Amino acid sequence: NNAVWVDWIQQVATAHWSNVASDEHQARYIWVVTRHEIDYRGNVGPGETVTAETFIPRGPTGARFDRRVDFRDAAGKVIVSANTTWAMLERESGRLARVREDVTAPFRPFADEG
């Protein structure tokens, strides 16, 4: 169901941030979703598995950073694609924070950079 896919999208994004971002940045910033755009091209049944792949399609705009998550079935076919927009907040103040180069560096190259 739709809510399950949204939960998986958030889990994948969170895992990517946790595994790539520095400890300092993880302690200083949090992310909130401002937009989900999800395309459904297939479904999975009970007992079937999917594989998720995530990447950053382009650099940030101010406090916002887009992310793409594709889910593939066992045959490798993309069955769900999601484009999500995240906003970065300063953990202490809860205020929007411009996404700086040192925050983005570990996630490069972006898809639009070849």
Each predicted region: which residue ranges?
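Hot-dog-fold acyl-thioester-processing enzymes
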Residues: 1-35, 89-114
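Short structured motifs
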Residues: 34-41, 52-53, 66
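HotDog/MaoC-like acyl-thioester-processing domains
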Residues: 43-49, 57-114
